[in-house]
């Protein structure tokens, strides 16, 4: 049975294996054991209540409960940009006009922005390609909404998610090649690694401070503004079905889109509800896949089951209860996947 749980110190080697499979561009999952160990420690201290809000971040893993195999990772940053500036480009417009010459030009322009400072962030979503089946991607991505719904007071009113932009298998980013490299004088992979290992001072030191006309970029770079990496397209679709939208903010490195949504308008958060759980044999039928989560902050668990999403009393097997760390009579959080999201 696949289950979402909080990260543990012993997961570092499994996370290293996942990091080696990302293909680059996933800044928050570098193949660097020391950095990953620090990230795990920060998550543990967040759960223990030892960090200020500006440093808090939760990390979860997707595990096969029978074998202990870690198949994926996802995370939530509680409030971005309160220690180090959190940069985007806002894709806007500058107008240059002359009535005398009868010239009017509306030019797409990139403006350096810190507009999402303080927002909660969905990040570090990666599922091992071997496990991209049977609804595991939905479970991994949406489990964070179950945690946010259960512990709403831990998070801010806006949630953002940076989507990985267009990068090829060799680490070539058209957007970086045309823009970032001119200011940072390094390859994309080097900048990505420095950022992922916490060495972010160079961003503030070398970033272009003035608006940039996109027409000055190569056509290849212009074409990937706001576009996602092919492997990231499913993750974008999942978030958009939950209510997230692209509001013309992009990543400063690869030009990938930043999606955003008010936390209380996220479908899974808004529609999830608490029901009593009982032990027994679940009813058979053509029921939809639903997320089921306990309400245990320190031992949070989420699984995917097929059940009636309108039930007032959820029947689970002894094995399911055990994985969820629940007992008969406990209350669990329940919400169905979107109607079009299939797990077969």
UniProtKB/Swiss-Prot annotation:
Active-site residue numbers: 229 (proton donor)
Gene3D superfamilies: 2.40.40.20
InterPro entries the record matches: Acyl_CoA_acyltransferase (IPR016181), Arg_succinylTrfase_AstA/AruG (IPR007041), Arginine_N-succinylTrfase (IPR017650)
Entry keyword Transmembrane helix: no
Keywords for the protein's UniProt record, in alphabetical order: Acyltransferase, Arginine metabolism, Transferase
Record bears the keyword Transferase: yes
Catalytic activity, as annotated: succinyl-CoA + L-arginine = N(2)-succinyl-L-arginine + CoA + H(+)
Pathway per the UniProt entry: Amino-acid degradation; L-arginine degradation via AST pathway; L-glutamate and succinate from L-arginine: step 1/5
Transmembrane segments annotated in the record for this chain: none
Annotated residues for binding of succinyl-CoA: 125
GO molecular function: arginine N-succinyltransferase activity
Described purpose of this protein according to its UniProt entry: Catalyzes the transfer of succinyl-CoA to arginine to produce N(2)-succinylarginine.
Family: Belongs to the arginine N-succinyltransferase family.
Protein's name in the database: Arginine N-succinyltransferase
């Amino acid at each position: 049975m696949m289950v979402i749980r909080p990260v543990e110190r012993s997961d570092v080697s499994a996370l290293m294996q996942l990091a080696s499979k990302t293909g680059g561009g996933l800044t928050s999952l570098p193949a660097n054991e020391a950095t990953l160990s620090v990230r795990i420690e920060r998550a543990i201290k967040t759960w223990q209540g030892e960090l200020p809000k500006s440093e808090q971040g939760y990390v979860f893993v997707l595990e096969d409960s029978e074998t202990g195999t870690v198949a994926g990772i996802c995370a939530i940053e509680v409030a971005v940009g309160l220690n180090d500036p959190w940069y985007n480009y806002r894709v806007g417009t500058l107008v240059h006009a002359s009535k005398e010459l009868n010239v009017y030009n509306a030019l797409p322009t990139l403006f350096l922005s810190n507009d999402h400072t303080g927002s909660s962030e969905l990040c570090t979503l990666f599922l091992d390609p071997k496990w991209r089946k049977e609804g595991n991607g939905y479970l991994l991505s949406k489990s964070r909404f179950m945690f946010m719904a259960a512990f709403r007071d831990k998070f801010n009113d806006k949630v953002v998610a940076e989507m990985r932009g267009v990068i090829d298998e060799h680490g070539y980013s058209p957007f970086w090649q045309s823009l970032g490299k001119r200011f940072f004088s390094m390859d994309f992979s080097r900048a990505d690694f420095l950022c992922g290992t916490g060495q972010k001072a160079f961003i503030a030191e070398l970033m272009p401070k003035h608006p940039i006309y996109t027409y000055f970029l190569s056509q290849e770079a212009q074409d990937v503004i706001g576009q996602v990496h092919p492997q990231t397209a499913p993750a974008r679709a999942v978030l958009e079905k939950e209510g997230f939208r692209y509001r013309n903010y992009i990543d400063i490195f690869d030009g990938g889109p930043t999606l955003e949504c008010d936390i209380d308008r996220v479908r899974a958060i808004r529609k999830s509800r608490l029901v009593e759980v009982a032990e027994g044999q679940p009813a058979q039928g053509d029921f939809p896949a639903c997320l089921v989560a306990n309400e245990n902050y320190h031992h949070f668990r989420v699984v995917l089951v097929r059940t009636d999403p309108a039930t007032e009393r959820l029947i689970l097997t002894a094995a399911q209860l055990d994985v969820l760390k629940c007992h008969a009579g406990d209350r669990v959080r329940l919400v169905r996947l979107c109607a079009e999201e299939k797990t077969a």
